[in-house]
Design a protein with these regions (language model features):
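Metal-dependent de-N-acetylase/amidase catalytic core
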Residues: 2-12, 90, 94-213
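Active-site rim/loop-helix segments in enzyme catalytic domains that contact anionic ligands
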Residues: 1-112, 139, 143
Length: 213
């Protein structure tokens, strides 16, 4: 297990929707930027269907709201390098895998990361967009012969038990998800405090439409 975020080197996060980056890697990105590491993020969709109130926030209006929220989240974490792929929210599984992978290959060639952060094959929450993006990343890294290590977001039992009620209330996970791993089996595990935790919370709060009142 790596003991420090600095062991990750330069980082490329590849996620499906705005707020995935904050929820699954906000602490890592903030700490890495504090340490002077290069961090870039790729987002597959604008999450235009990601609201509990689609009447108040129809997709054609929500697009710009989510874009603004994502910009604010990344700025809070100190990340200023971002690429948007522009796929339809909820439609990543319908994208030809080779097309999605080619877009990730472009990002890998551009940023030459030491580490790529993304979803595991189960998509962490089980969302089809997440699972599709995970496959694109795997195919892209293999196709580019990149030296980058790929790390998947995962969960451990104590975390799931501690926040079980919250996860249920907000329907965070599909049935049977996420996969559970022991901390000793993880590539890196950290518990954040201080300014790093503060910034992760603020980055999550930026996604106000997604979270609801």
């Amino acid at each position: 297990m790596m003991t420090s975020v600095t062991d990750l080197g330069s980082i490329l996060g590849v996620w499906a929707h705005p707020d995935d980056e904050a929820f699954l890697s906000g602490g890592i990105m903030a700490a890495a930027r504090d340490a002077g590491q290069a961090v870039a993020v790729v987002t597959a969709t604008l999450g235009e269907h990601g609201t509990p109130d689609p009447v108040a926030f129809p997709p054609h209006e929500l697009t710009e709201v989510r874009r603004h929220e994502l910009d604010r989240s990344l700025a809070t974490l100190g990340v200023h390098t971002h690429r948007m792929l522009g796929y339809r929210d909820g439609g990543c599984a319908a994208v030809a895998p080779e097309h999605g992978a080619s877009r990730i290959m472009q990002a890998i060639d551009e940023f030459e990361p030491d580490t790529v952060l993304t979803f595991g094959p189960d998509g962490y929450t089980g969302h089809p967009d997440h699972r599709a993006v995970s496959g694109w990343v795997t195919d892209a890294v293999l196709a580019t012969n990149s030296h980058a290590r790929v790390l998947h977001a995962t969960a451990e039992h104590d975390f799931l038990s501690r926040f079980h009620d919250i996860h249920d209330r907000f329907n965070v996970f599909f049935a049977g998800k996420p996969s559970v791993n022991r901390i000793t089996d993880m590539a890196i595990h950290a518990e954040w405090g201080g300014s790093v935790l503060d910034r992760k919370v603020l980055a999550l709060a930026a996604s106000g439409v997604r979270q609801g009142p």
